Amino acid sequence: MKDYVAFDLETTGLSPDSDQIIEIGAVKIRDGKISGKYNCIIHPEIEVSDFIINLTGISRDMLRKGIPLKEGVEEFLEFSGDLPILGHNVMF
């Protein structure tokens, strides 16, 4: 596969039931080379622990200025277009 989008998420924790996405990062690969980048910080609806702040390097100020999840997902999908989407470290 020569053309695709690889993405990675940062979250408030590991629970799909109670934790939330706080960052979406992606690169678009065309002909084996990076042809575009996308990154957004998501404003979470829950408090983020000091552990996650330190682990991700995403500050509380950055989170306060983040965009809503729906907006971030819409932007990511627009960035991705019709390319296959591959997740990074999706097994955790």
Where are these regions (language model features)?
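Conserved non-catalytic scaffold segment of RNase H-like nuclease domains
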Residues: M1-F92
